[in-house]
């Protein structure tokens, strides 16, 4: 493997878990537990652990560059994507290498994990911090678009949204196989998307060990047919105790299902004592327009979406990417 002085740059190997977590907890001055770490990097539905490590003979793991892997659909092809998160370098090693250890790790990560070969991710993306310009300059990261949010104030006592009597929205601990069929029916609408099937929803929401989400499904009362699903949570992001429409899978032209699911998410937000509901949709997606017609406004955020891809370019993704807040690890 390539070396930088006393450092070895290498991919993750089984058994590294505790050492990697120790490095991240030290760098971020936090306490993330091992179960959460394994959920994030090991137990994902893509079955890939996308991590590049810097190891010192005496100090152990001193740097991490990695991504959460997930199955994705791109131009009709099933591929793997990765959301880059939790990069870190211990402070005493930041200056190692010509451009610093972050750049050394990032280059090794992209060389190993970005591509169209077996075990690689076709694209990786992230919501970068203030230091992103180094990644743009040295690692080729490109800006896809800003992450604007849709929001609606929900003051206490506001009347519930009227919905169709033909539909029923309920909460479930996890989605069943019907959601696989729903995604398959809708897949043609999406140029690029994470594969929102049962395995992904189970991993991203139902099985996350340190946070609870509300999973909602909309069905026809008479037939029981699944029309759409949504995911809701409350978190201290944007402002304290904010409600979030985290995920959404429903036909773009099914306004009855849109209204029914949205009404249920709004009621869940109010029941949690929150007076603000936020969500994210692609600005070119018709759902972005529909929510504005249903009373939502648009606001900018500090976040923006960046990308490295082995195929196409940032413009392709900018125009075709179906994303929600659930594509990130913010909530």
Q: For the regions a protein language model found, what residue spans apply to each?
A:
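A conserved beta-strand-loop-helix scaffold within acyl/acetyltransferase catalytic domains
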Residues: 7-87, 129-130, 173-251
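Conserved N-terminal entry element of GNAT/NAT acetyltransferase domains
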Residues: 1-15, 156-175
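Conserved acetyl-CoA-binding loop-helix of GNAT-fold acetyltransferases
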Residues: 89, 94-113, 255-267
């Amino acid at each position: 493997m390539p070396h930088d002085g006393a450092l070895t740059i290498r991919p993750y190997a089984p058994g590294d878990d505790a050492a990697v977590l120790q490095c991240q907890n030290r760098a971020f001055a936090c306490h993330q537990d091992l179960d959460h770490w394994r959920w994030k990097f090991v137990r994902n539905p893509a079955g890939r652990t996308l991590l590049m490590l810097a190891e010192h003979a005496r100090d152990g793991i001193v740097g991490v560059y990695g991504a959460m892997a997930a199955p994705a659909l791109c131009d009709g092809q099933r591929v793997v994507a990765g959301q880059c998160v939790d990069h870190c370098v211990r402070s005493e090693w930041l200056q190692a290498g010509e451009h610093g250890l972050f750049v050394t790790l990032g280059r090794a990560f992209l060389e190993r994990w970005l591509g169209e070969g077996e075990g690689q991710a076709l694209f990786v993306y992230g919501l970068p911090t203030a230091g992103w310009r180094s990644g743009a300059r040295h690692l080729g990261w490109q800006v896809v678009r800003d992450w604007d949010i849709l929001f609606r104030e929900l003051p206490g006592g506001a009347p519930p949204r009227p919905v169709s009597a033909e539909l029923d929205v309920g909460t479930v601990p996890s989605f069943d196989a019907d959601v696989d069929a729903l995604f398959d029916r809708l897949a043609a609408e999406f140029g690029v998307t994470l594969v929102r099937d049962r395995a992904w929803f189970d991993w991203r929401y139902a099985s996350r060990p340190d946070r609870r989400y509300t999973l909602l499904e909309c069905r026809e009362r008479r037939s029981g047919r699944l029309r759409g699903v949504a995911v809701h949570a409350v978190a201290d992001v944007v402002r304290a105790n904010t409600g979030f429409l985290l995920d959404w899978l429903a036909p773009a032209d099914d306004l009855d299902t849109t209204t029914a699911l949205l009404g249920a998410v709004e009621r869940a937000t109010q029941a949690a004592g929150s007076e603000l509901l936020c969500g994210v949709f692609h600005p070119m997606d018709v759902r972005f327009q529909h929510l504005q017609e249903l009373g939502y406004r648009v606001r900018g955020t500090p976040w923006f979406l960046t990308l490295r891809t082995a195929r196409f370019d940032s413009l392709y993704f900018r125009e075709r990417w179906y994303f929600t807040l659930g594509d990130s690890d913010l909530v």
